[in-house]
Amino acid sequence: MGKVVQLFTHPLELKAALKLKFLREPLYPADDTQGSAELKRCYQLLQRTSRSFAAVIMELHPELRNAVMLFYLILRALDTVEDDMTISPKVKVPLLREFDQKLKLDTWSFDGNAKTEKDRDVLVEFSTILAEFHKLKPEYQQVIADITHKMGNGMADYILDEKFNLSGLETIQDYDRYCHYVAGLVGDGLTHLIMLAKFSSPGLYYDSPDLYESMGLFLQKTNIIRDYAEDLADGRSFWPKEIWSHYADDLASFSKPENATAGVYCINHLVLNALGHVQHVLTYLASLREQSSFQFCAIPQVMAIATLALVFGNERVLQTSVKIRKGTTCYLILKSRTFQGCVEIFEHYLRDIRKRLTVADPNYLKLNIEIAKLDKFIEEMYQDKLPVGAKPQETEIYKKVRERSAYDLEVLPREQEEEFKFNVLLSILFTVFGALYWYAK
């Protein structure tokens, strides 16, 4: 009931939710009548592990859809092994290090997870995943195997790292390294697949590792900030000591009411660190040349900037995991279909952060400088406010955005058609209710 009330008190979000549910047509709707029983089961497993990821994966271009789906399930299997505290390190560590070798087998499964582990079926039915994995193009298989190898070994290293297990992450460099293994590698693999499918230039993968690394780190750092209370309850922490030690002697002390102000300043410092990836994120999105891949990459990023704005200055983060409204999610999904829409979303939330920034915040100046730097970068993208007669500077990002804008124009007719249908339906509803009201009188 609360979510319904939220929608009706935010009309733009209500409109977006109705459009998304009833009017928007996917670019490449999946055909469930095609494919093997194994493939159908893989998509069922995907739906069970993550409905949100399943929704965006299902709308990918057919060239990439199965590859990305299997990539996700394989990494989910790896993560399910790593997360299960009931598995002995003597079993877990070698399994993580050798997990990529399992991809060479025709059949293999693992039934060693706790019965309460929600995603254990992915491992129990791993032979089903293998059957479809071996149908992928060899180059796609190689990308997935390489990332699985790197991620599995990274996970194993952290399990054996006594310093990490005792005191968490010490430095910002440690923080970046951890985020690389759990999210940066995903950006690496996805970008490699997108490049092999010819949905981006080869340079996006081979020449721009900082861009796809930032795509992963921006998402992971946002989640780490948001999940402070949840992680603390689980007896773990990922906020780096190099940042939190400025505000407390003990990370857990932020959860005490008397330390809420210090905790908020620490949150804002972490937000400042995450904002350092935004320029790379926008540059990456401007480099994509296929619409479904663009939407697949853009949606999580706009959710992340919205979440960063939500956690900024928000002491509730110290007590519970906060989430953006469902209606906001619907609005962002529709708005982020164009690159310009994504940029406008980032601009909106950056303004929101700056508006709520207080002079008392220790990072007041640094946050203002970072946001001003991003404002300037966004101006450079479009250069649409130049004096009469002035020519735009042909910078690399300006040229990227100009090329990307051609793809945005292809999306506009779809948006206009949805708006037309919505207005027609709204007119019909008003007419019907008006007639009923007149008749009742």
Swiss-Prot record:
Alphabetical list of PROSITE patterns matching this protein: SQUALEN_PHYTOEN_SYN_1 (PS01044), SQUALEN_PHYTOEN_SYN_2 (PS01045)
Entry protein name: Squalene synthase
Gene Ontology process terms (BP): ergosterol biosynthetic process; farnesyl diphosphate metabolic process; isoprenoid biosynthetic process via mevalonate
CDD domains, per database record: Trans_IPPS_HH
Function: Catalyzes the condensation of 2 two farnesyl pyrophosphate moieties to form squalene. It is the first committed enzyme of the sterol biosynthesis pathway. Required for the biosynthesis of ergosterol.
Residue intervals passing through the bilayer: 293-313, 420-440
InterPro entries (alphabetical): Isoprenoid_synthase_dom_sf, Squ/phyt_synthse, Squal_synth-like, Squalene/phytoene_synthase_CS, Trans_IPPS_euk-type, Trans_IPPS_HH
EC numbers for this chain: 2.5.1.21
Keywords: Endoplasmic reticulum, Isoprene biosynthesis, Lipid biosynthesis, Lipid metabolism, Magnesium, Membrane, Multifunctional enzyme, NADP, Steroid biosynthesis, Steroid metabolism, Sterol biosynthesis, Sterol metabolism, Transferase, Transmembrane, Transmembrane helix
Main location, first listed in the record: endoplasmic reticulum
Required cofactor(s): Mg(2+)
Family under the similarity heading: Belongs to the phytoene/squalene synthase family.
Enzyme class per UniProt: transferase
Source organism (scientific name): Eremothecium gossypii (strain ATCC 10895 / CBS 109.51 / FGSC 9923 / NRRL Y-1056)
Gene name tied to this protein: ERG9
